[in-house]
Amino acid sequence: MPKNKKRNTPHRGSSAGGGGSGAAAATAATAGGQHRNVQPFSDEDASIETMSHCSGYSDPSSFAEDGPEVLDEEGTQEDLEYKLKGLIDLTLDKSAKTRQAALEGIKNALASKMLYEFILERRMTLTDSIERCLKKGKSDEQRAAAALASVLCIQLGPGIESEEILKTLGPILKKIICDGSASMQARQTCATCFGVCCFIATDDITELYSTLECLENIFTKSYLKEKDTTVICSTPNTVLHISSLLAWTLLLTICPINEVKKKLEMHFHKLPSLLSCDDVNMRIAAGESLALLFELARGIESDFFYEDMESLTQMLRALATDGNKHRAKVDKRKQRSVFRDVLRAVEERDFPTETIKFGPERMYIDCWVKKHTYDTFKEVLGSGMQYHLQSNEFLRNVFELGPPVMLDAATLKTMKISRFERHLYNSAAFKARTKARSKCRDKRADVGEFF
């Protein structure tokens, strides 16, 4: 959709004045040269058509199109806020598709730019819209609403405002997660949202324990029964169980030591059964969760002893060198890469350090807790993760990065290295990486795959 910022200027009063989304949409449609007699609330088709004729402020995709380029232009903060006001109005539209698009547009904007003051003033309105869409919406709309709730809490950070959001939305999210008749995709997104919002906002230990129990009741349904000796077959519920397990693992990292000990006793001997699931994503989620549990256990007791270590390492080694012809090559490569690291963590207490670069800064991920936390927020924020690592005080506190670094354009320019120096650095890094990977690579893993 073309960018029509200047065309919107004369009509700003019509949408910001709270006259209703339908009136704003109809006015914008007339200004855009459409001479039809549009009735936005007559039915869903009319409402969708109205939205398609709205000027730039109501087009959620315009955030993705404009991106950082728009945010660098003069006066763009006002334009961005004007677009967001229009999208907030459209969350009340009668059309489900219009509401969903508006929710996604707001989420994309909040994921790509810090707008703390703007949403602080409108947090109650946004919370009401999310609550309404979660209660009355269907699958895609509920997913969009839950995703927006996560980003909203990330923007606000820990505090009374986020606590109020969790207090309002928490019971609804829990109800959807446990509702067997609800869409599986919606339940999956709500499980992730519930974990993220609780991680950020909860200040009540009983509420934290209640959330852990809710998530446990979901993913433990994938555990093998005592009499079962066969492989766990994936079901439509597997995606929900994966999201619940990952959200549960995230919350476990902020639990008191006594609670962590209880959870370790409950799950340490049952969680390995998920490694036999025929879904590669479940196997990977279970493996990474096990590595994190070992890290927590050894952090509490340096001489921690696991009784079934031999059988567990055999299972992990088999997954790290899996050559099963009945599995996709991409899945096998992904699985082998992950389980080589998991095996090293369990056997040698080792973690392969990763470096995340954002702007002029670097962050080193040197433990499973940090990796899991980063992966969770990366899943929620997508491409906006790097921006939030630079600007979001909450995330910088989580990853111990200190206050945001404020650098002007001239300073940034002097920090850049020349192309030749960058080439030398990349060549050396490539050579070192190749040597390191060749040591870990199992050269026999792919033998026989093409026969």
Swiss-Prot record:
SUPFAM superfamilies: ARM repeat. Residues 49-61 have a biased composition (Polar residues). Disulfide bonds: none annotated. Residues 1-10 have a biased composition (Basic residues). Coiled coil: none annotated. Keywords: Developmental protein, Differentiation. Pfam families: IFRD (PF05004), IFRD_C (PF04836). Belongs to the IFRD family. This is Interferon-related developmental regulator 1. It comes from Homo sapiens (Human). The lineage of its organism: Eukaryota, Metazoa, Chordata, Craniata, Vertebrata.
